[in-house]
A protein has these predicted regions:
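N-terminal pilin/flagellin-like segments and related low-complexity appendage regions
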Residues: 53-273
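Aliphatic-rich helix starts adjacent to a transmembrane/signal segment
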Residues: 3-58, 62-64
């Protein structure tokens, strides 16, 4: 008859110790894998957000200076000083049309008239794009829409000898003193296009809880965000409104290719002043 001998206390302790070591190693491995996966997902989001931001900017910049049928941009008067993109008066908007692309190189305090220093990441560039929407609408439709919305009309003058442009608001469309240009038939008033001013900048937060970004925004963890301030209308008044575009954008630096010889190709890379 064979007797079975149980495990001693020492053997039990050794077994438990080995098990705990294996469990600790497995836990550490799972934790590292989870951390690695989280970092990969974070990197993927950053790459995708950056790609999306570039796509948005690319699409808008391609249309910079598009003013409908009015293609003689070189005939536009160039103001003596750099225009303020925050101004919304029709006269200011019209005088700035020659600057279809306007940039600010790493300003420290944003744009004093519409982008407060607290809402702009210091040292990041600001880009301004001016153009019109490709889609047209009739003067009657513009008159029935928001009164403060700015529109551009391009067409023939009453004499039929000159092609020109007119800039005005939806309120102007209810009369006949501003939008007076014609189609090529000389009798039908030319259609209108929304006039656009887009100001792109990097903000230290995504959703503001107050009038300016603060440490309490975005759940107490402010997310740097690419935002766009756009010419719009509210309550019959022309104004600027801000829209968050892409979260996770911490910096924006822009170089400008300038064609100095008129051959259609950039001859050098420059930064804005």
């Amino acid at each position: 008859m064979h007797h079975q001998r149980g495990m001693t206390l020492v053997e039990w302790m050794v077994s438990i110790t080995i098990g705990l070591v294996l469990l600790a190693g497995l836990t550490a491995l799972i934790a590292r894998q989870s951390s690695t996966q989280a970092e990969l997902e974070k990197s993927s989001r950053q790459i995708e957000n950056g790609r999306y931001a570039m796509q948005l900017l690319n699409e808008d910049i391609q249309l910079a200076g598009y003013y409908g049928e009015f293609s003689n941009v070189s005939a536009l008067a160039v103001p003596g000083t750099l225009p303020d993109p925050c101004l919304t008066a029709v006269s200011d908007l019209e005088s700035a049309m020659a600057f279809s692309v306007q940039g600010y190189d790493s300003p420290a305090t944003g744009l004093s008239t519409c982008i407060a220093a607290a809402n702009h990441v210091s040292g990041t560039d600001i880009l301004v794009v001016r153009r019109v929407e490709p889609a047209t609408l009739t003067i009657a439709a513009a008159a029935a829409a928001a009164g403060g919305q700015v529109y551009l009309q391009s067409g023939l003058t009453a004499s039929g000898l000159e092609f020109s442009k007119k800039l005005g608001t939806g309120a102007d469309a209810s009369g006949t003193s501003v939008f007076t240009l014609f189609n090529k038939d000389g009798t039908t008033l030319a259609s209108l296009r929304k006039f656009l001013v887009h100001i792109y900048f990097v903000s230290p937060c995504s959703v503001m809880s107050g009038a300016a970004c603060s440490g309490s925004d975005d759940g107490g963890k402010p997310i740097p965000t690419l935002k766009m301030m756009a010419l719009s209308a509210s309550g019959g008044t022309t104004t600027m409104s801000t829209t968050p575009l892409v979260e996770g954008i911490e910096n924006m630096q822009i170089d400008y290719g300038i064609d100095t010889t008129g051959d259609g190709a950039p001859d050098g890379q420059f930064v804005a002043t």
